[in-house]
Amino acid sequence: KHTFDRKNELAILGFGAIDDMKLNTGMEDMSEKNQYILAYLPVVKQKTYTLGAVYKHYSGKNIYSLIVSRSQLNNKNIKYRDNDESSEENLTLNYRSDEIENKLRSENIFRFPFFRLNVGGNLEYATYTNRTYQKQFTTIPRVINYHTDLGLLKWGLYATAIYESDNERFTASLGVRADANDYSPEMNNLLDQLSPRLSLSYRLFGAVYLNGSIGRYYELPPYTVLGFKDNQGNYLNKANHLTYIRSDQAGLGLEYRPSSYLKFSAEGFYKKYDQYPMSLVDSIPLASKGTDYGVLGNEAVSSTATGRAYGLELTGRWYNYKGLTFIASYTYV
């Protein structure tokens, strides 16, 4: 981080990770459960990094921020039948992909008596390359073999107004966001992905607060879904009129703040999902397939699945302990 003067500063941050997985086929405990796990898990090798910079300009009570970043995920999944690599005939999956995202975000924070206004926009260009060879053993066995080079331009706008009472007893936040991209006509209109949201907080007594929130959120399906092709090179999910995933969410709970660096909360939540990708191969929503290992979404889908989730979440947060932040949570769904 570098401070040019009292009005201008620049911060640069980066990190990376490597995941080099191997299957323990020589374990002594070859129970039925372990045999099943070894039979379906592929060998996964991943490399990822993110590099970004934040420029801030302070003008009185207002703050202007410009954020640029680049991230990349290199992913390789390989699987042989019975984990026997002695013959290429045993190869059932060879998946190699690269996801690269270049992001630019501009934001202004305007401060007024009793409320703050955040407005901004973002522009992003993503590239997704994929080389897939996969044998699918369904009712009719088939081989999937294709190559994808997908470029995707994304854009968005957002605004949030935050009000805080003079005695700091009541806080309200009202915001709206809109996102779009050039993947298809179903996704390129900002108004089709309009996301309003509202959150309220009221201090009941002492350090105990009642919090509530409600909002609509949109999420882009995974790149594996966007970039899936048939063996003739056609983007099947684009032809299937793929859309953003929609989620309506509401939450209500209590929060205890014994100090400026400690928070404990209990919140009940309800989430409703629409336009979720549904597999056309086995009629199972992608959300029900699990994402622990392997490739998710590398298949033909339609945006027709619905769902819901509700439960209780307990959270504890400890801020700025020797420069560190600790968060512990338990969720019952």
Language-model segment annotations:
Residues 17, 23-32, 37-38, 68, ...:
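Outer-membrane beta-barrel translocator domains and adjoining extracellular loop/strand segments
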Residues 158, 195-199:
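One-face residue pattern on beta-strands with alternating periodicity enriched for small/polar residues
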Residues 3-20, 42-187, 203, 262-265, ...:
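Face-selective signature of the C-terminal outer-membrane beta-barrel domain
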